[in-house]
């Protein structure tokens, strides 16, 4: 348990940041699920539209360090490959 005033404040700040980061991670997962659902449904146009919406969100979260930039790049690459395979 934090005893000093600054330790108590840091604990409060950490709780707030953790909740915010969890919210952002959840948002990213939701966008990615929409893309995957469109791909599984075989709907290329919906998948492309969902992908176009998800990519800026993914990049923004990666820039903030919520997820690693390589993980964001991996998601983008794999989803794009699946969409291209769907269109071909």
From Swiss-Prot:
<keyword id="KW-0687">Ribonucleoprotein</keyword>
<dbReference type="GO" id="GO:0003735">
    <property type="term" value="F:structural constituent of ribosome"/>
</dbReference>
<dbReference type="GO" id="GO:0005829">
    <property type="term" value="C:cytosol"/>
</dbReference>
<keyword id="KW-0699">rRNA-binding</keyword>
<dbReference type="GO" id="GO:0070181">
    <property type="term" value="F:small ribosomal subunit rRNA binding"/>
</dbReference>
<dbReference type="GO" id="GO:0006412">
    <property type="term" value="P:translation"/>
</dbReference>
<dbReference type="InterPro" id="IPR002583">
    <property type="entry name" value="Ribosomal_bS20"/>
</dbReference>
<dbReference type="InterPro" id="IPR036510">
    <property type="entry name" value="Ribosomal_bS20_sf"/>
</dbReference>
<comment type="function">
    <text>Binds directly to 16S ribosomal RNA.</text>
</comment>
<comment type="similarity">
    <text>Belongs to the bacterial ribosomal protein bS20 family.</text>
</comment>
<feature type="region of interest" description="Disordered">
    <location>
        <begin position="1"/>
        <end position="23"/>
    </location>
</feature>
<protein>
    <recommendedName>
        <fullName>Small ribosomal subunit protein bS20</fullName>
    </recommendedName>
</protein>
<keyword id="KW-0694">RNA-binding</keyword>
<keyword id="KW-0689">Ribosomal protein</keyword>
<dbReference type="GO" id="GO:0015935">
    <property type="term" value="C:small ribosomal subunit"/>
</dbReference>
<dbReference type="Pfam" id="PF01649">
    <property type="entry name" value="Ribosomal_S20p"/>
</dbReference>
């Amino acid at each position: 348990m934090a005893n000093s005033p600054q330790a108590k404040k840091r604990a409060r700040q950490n709780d707030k940041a953790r909740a915010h980061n969890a919210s952002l991670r959840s948002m990213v997962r939701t966008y990615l699920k929409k893309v995957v659902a469109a791909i599984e449904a075989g709907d290329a146009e919906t998948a492309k539209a969902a992908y176009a919406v998800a990519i800026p969100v993914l990049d923004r979260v990666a820039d903030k360090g919520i997820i690693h930039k390589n993980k964001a790049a991996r998601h983008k690459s794999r989803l794009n490959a699946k969409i291209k395979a769907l269109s071909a």
